Amino acid sequence: MFDDLPTLTHAEQQVAVEKIQKLMAEGISTGEAIKIVAQQIREDKKAQNQGTH
């Protein structure tokens, strides 16, 4: 499930945790919140990588 998840800095990990916690506070399940945030991270990293090439 996380094989294609890019490596994150500690600060990026903290932001991801905060996003997951916010989604969970809104009533989304833990698994779904992780899935949503992981997809956002993948998309952000992909966009960053495309911008550098």
From Swiss-Prot:
Highest taxon listed in the record's lineage: Bacteria
InterPro entries referenced in this protein's UniProt entry, alphabetically: UPF0181
Family that this chain belongs to: Belongs to the UPF0181 family.
HAMAP family assigned: UPF0181
Protein's name according to its UniProt entry: UPF0181 protein VC_A0569
The species this protein was found in: Vibrio cholerae serotype O1 (strain ATCC 39315 / El Tor Inaba N16961)
